[in-house]
A protein has these predicted regions:
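Glycine-rich phosphate-binding loop of actin/hexokinase-like ATP-binding domains
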Residues: 220-277
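AAA+ ATPase active-site-proximal loops
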Residues: 207, 233, 339
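ATP-binding/phosphotransfer module of carbohydrate and carboxylate kinases, centering on a glycine-rich
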Residues: 1-124, 130-151, 155-158, 262, ...
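Glycine-rich phosphate-binding loop and adjoining helix at the ATP-binding site
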Residues: 119-225, 349-360
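General beta-strand structural signal in soluble alpha/beta enzymes
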Residues: 73-75, 199-204, 237
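Short helix-capping/turn signature of helix-turn-helix
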Residues: 38-39, 216, 229-230
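Short, acidic, Ser/Thr-enriched surface-loop or helix-capping motifs
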Residues: 114, 171-172, 238
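Short glycine-aspartate micro-motif
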Residues: 88-90, 98-102, 110, 159-163, ...
Length: 402
């Protein structure tokens, strides 16, 4: 049976609860959590009004969430409400936390995010991972995870799960890296290398960047392409508020769209791929600069100082991005293209030629292009928030674990 194109990974948002009385209770617990997180602090009466349940039903649900440590009472509701004040409810700053991790070509990063959405702990290790076997890299990542978990536990948090962003194709088991050309990893089961006690999800870094934009960006954004870059380039396709994964889970490999079929060879085996013109190292080569260290900072600094070689290289990269994106825009008709990752820091020099190319080539009106506020932090935040969303979407999944 073919997998659904929009299917979410097991710990991601979107898992369907059963159509039973127990399933209805679990959905209502989730509705309470989302209402309080979005609009809180709220009284029980205000929650009932928001979600359309009786006060008695909401009170029962709230009591269960308080016992589970997911909600807390703050005292009288804030001023400005009509009628008798009730006890204000807020999402707890203690209890479950989402642990997000990122394996980059030249860094490892881990963070802990509480149910309120606040980052409570973070650790980063800079250094190349290219060409290194997965085992040593993941052991270093596991050490960072333990460091962040220990720091979070001192804050009264406990890990509800671990989500790992990687620069490559991930199988639908949400743990196996099928292929990561820029790391030279193939068929690597990260689940066998990471702490077994934490529920694990592995996904492409571009997908997690897109989910960060969906969950943390403009609340009206429901149909967009989120394009991010490091050495490679990936895209998350969000349609009607859901991530489009494709049959095998490989949707969004924008970096391997050929923009010049007779161009240079790519590590993927193709020729003339977008990455060979708009990836960080490709732009550095075109500008005559040596790769190393903060590649984006180096390019941005030279461009800001008027280096014509760098500006020309970025202009050409924007043109290549525009060519590759034209097909996606014509095919999917998104509301917006969002530049994230390294592209956000280079947007002032990429946008003019990118937007010109889109305007010239798209069949309909020009597609708006925006810059993500999360930049290179998007994949890490999206990974951590995927665990948080899983708890908010099914609070009973962590009942008894506090």
């Amino acid at each position: 049976m073919t997998a659904p194109l929009h299917e979410a990974h097991p710990t991601g948002s979107g898992r369907r609860l059963p159509d039973t009385q127990q399933g209805m209770r679990r959905r209502n617990l989730a509705r309470v959590m989302h209402a309080v997180r979005a609009e809180g602090p709220l009284s029980r009466a205000a929650v009932a009004s928001h979600i359309g349940l009786t006060r008695a039903a909401v009170s029962t649900l709230v009591d269960e969430l308080i016992r589970s440590g997911l909600l807390e009472e703050l005292g009288p509701e804030r001023p400005g409400r009509v009628g008798r004040p009730g006890s204000a409810l807020a999402v707890s700053g203690r209890g479950p936390a989402g642990i997000g991790a990122e394996v980059g070509v030249d860094h490892l990063a881990v963070c802990a995010v509480d149910l309120r959405g606040d980052v409570r702990a973070r650790a980063v290790r800079h250094g190349t991972n290219r060409g290194r076997p997965p085992g040593p890299v993941i052991r270093e990542l596991a050490a960072l995870v333990r460091q962040v978990v220990a720091e979070a536990e001192r804050e009264g948090l406990w890990p509800a799960g671990l989500a790992v962003a990687v620069p490559g194709l991930v199988a639908r088991d949400a743990r196996t890296v099928v292929r990561a050309p820029n790391l030279d990893w193939h068929d690597t089961d990260l689940g066998a290398l990471l702490p077994a006690e934490l529920p694990l999800t592995v996904d492409n870094e571009a997908n997690f960047g897109g989910l960060a934009e969906l969950w943390l960006g403009e609340p009206t954004a429901r149909d967009f392409l989120h394009v991010s870059a490091e050495i490679g380039i990936g895209a998350a396709v969000v349609v009607d508020g859901r991530l489009l994964r494709g049959t095998r889970g490989f949707a969004g490999e924008l970096g391997h769209v050929p923009v010049r079929p007779d161009g240079p060879e790519c590590p993927c085996g193709g020729r003339g791929c977008l990455e060979q013109y708009a990836g960080e190292e490709a732009v550095l080569r075109a500008a005559g600069l040596e790769p190393g260290g903060d590649r984006v900072g180096l390019l941005a600094d030279h461009a800001a100082r008027g280096d014509e070689d760098v500006r020309r290289a970025l202009h050409d990269a924007g043109t290549a991005l525009g060519i590759a994106l034209t097909g996606a825009v014509n095919l999917l008709d998104p509301e917006t293209v969002v530049l994230g990752g390294a592209l956000s820091g280079l947007a002032p020099w990429l946008l003019p030629s990118l937007e010109d190319e889109l305007a010239r080539r798209t069949a309909g009106p020009p597609c708006a292009v925006a810059v993500s506020r999360w930049g290179p932090q998007g994949p890490l935040l999206g990974a951590a928030h995927s665990v948080v969303r899983a708890v908010l979407d099914d609070p009973s999944s962590v009942a008894g674990r506090s």
